[in-house]
């Protein structure tokens, strides 16, 4: 049996610039961290060696892997030449909530299957393989940031070059400032599910066709460099202001990113003591992330208590094999 554990990510700034239509023209960058909420993938030989069994939100039992409905499962197994396995996925957080879970699944599955075959795969290799699987084989349009975050783990600055290559730079901070940043980020669940690919496809088309949308995305990219600078100088209170400006621009880039209810929750959060925030992921559902100075947190939690809080810590490892037998 092989078990892999792959973290979910929290994107702080830059999302959208990792879309091919943008980074091929301008380059792109994202600053994100992974958290201690995970996707677990287990694999072991099926009792019936001629049968492949997949357990996720549903159960599939097939004799031929071409009959698998789940496109990532099917194409990864075909790519690795594997069948006759029983594979299960279990997640700490539901899909469609803006934490990059679909890419955490893909990264974790590729890592798991390589380990099953006793083949080593590095973090850059598994990230690139997941990008290829999602963007070129099953044709989703969710960019590159989620796969790299899931593979590498930690607080990183990801630079997406025009030629398609990706540079990964750890964001280095004093330990005390790093822990305070972790404390000052509060995540509230606002419910629902989204299809990130649909929102990102609209955003991608808007960036290409509308000058104001493209300029907005370029400004978000500039803010990502600003955020990197401020964090590396341990100025964590700058995070709130940058998140605030980032969200005000991002919500204009596609129709499905925000709605009046989300806008109302955001304004309430600011009035309750947050200095900035954003809806995580492509938008449309999931979690609001707020930056709240520690001295304002008691008031903030009291006034926002109708939205469930999900406590978290930063993850530092990325995708990992945690059990082999």
Language-model regions, residue ranges each:
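Short active-site loop/helix that positions an aromatic residue
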Residues: 25
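Aspartate-rich (DDxxD/NDxxD/DxxxD) Mg2+/diphosphate-binding motifs
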Residues: 94
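C-terminal nucleotide
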Residues: 1-11, 18-21, 30-32, 38-81, ...
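Residues at or immediately flanking beta-strands
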Residues: 84-86
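Short, small-residue alpha-helix embedded
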Residues: 103-117, 285-290
């Amino acid at each position: 049996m092989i078990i892999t554990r792959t973290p979910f990510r929290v994107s702080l700034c830059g999302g959208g610039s990792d879309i091919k239509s943008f980074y091929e023209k301008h380059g792109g960058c994202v600053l994100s961290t992974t958290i201690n909420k995970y996707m677990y993938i287990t694999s072991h030989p099926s009792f019936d060696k001629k049968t492949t069994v997949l357990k996720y939100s549903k159960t599939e039992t097939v004799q031929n892997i071409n009959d698998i409905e789940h496109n990532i499962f099917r194409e990864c197994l075909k790519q690795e030449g594997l069948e006759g396995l029983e594979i299960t996925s279990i997640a700490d957080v539901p899909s469609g909530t803006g934490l990059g879970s679909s890419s955490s699944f893909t990264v974790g599955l590729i890592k798991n299957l390589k380990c099953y075959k006793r083949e080593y795969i590095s973090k850059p290799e598994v990230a690139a393989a997941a990008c290829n699987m999602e963007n070129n084989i099953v044709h989703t349009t969710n960019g590159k940031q989620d796969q790299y975050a899931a593979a590498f783990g930690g607080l990183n600055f990801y630079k997406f070059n025009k030629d398609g290559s990706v540079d990964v730079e750890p964001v280095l901070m004093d330990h005390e400032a790093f822990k305070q940043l972790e404390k000052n980020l509060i995540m509230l669940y606002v419910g629902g599910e989204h299809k990130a690919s649909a929102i990102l496809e609209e955003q991608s088309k808007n960036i290409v066709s509308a000058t104001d949308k493209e300029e907005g995305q370029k400004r978000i990219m500039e803010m990502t460099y600003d955020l990197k600078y401020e964090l590396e100088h341990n100025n964590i209170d700058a995070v709130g202001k940058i998140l605030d400006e980032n969200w005000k621009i991002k919500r204009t880039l596609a129709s499905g990113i925000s709605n009046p209810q989300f806008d109302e929750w955001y304004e309430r959060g600011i009035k309750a003591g947050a200095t900035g925030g954003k809806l995580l992921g492509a938008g449309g559902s999931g979690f609001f992330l707020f930056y709240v100075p520690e001295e304002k947190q008691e008031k903030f939690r009291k006034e926002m208590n109708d939205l469930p809080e999900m406590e978290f810590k930063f993850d530092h490892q990325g995708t990992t094999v945690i059990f082999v037998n």
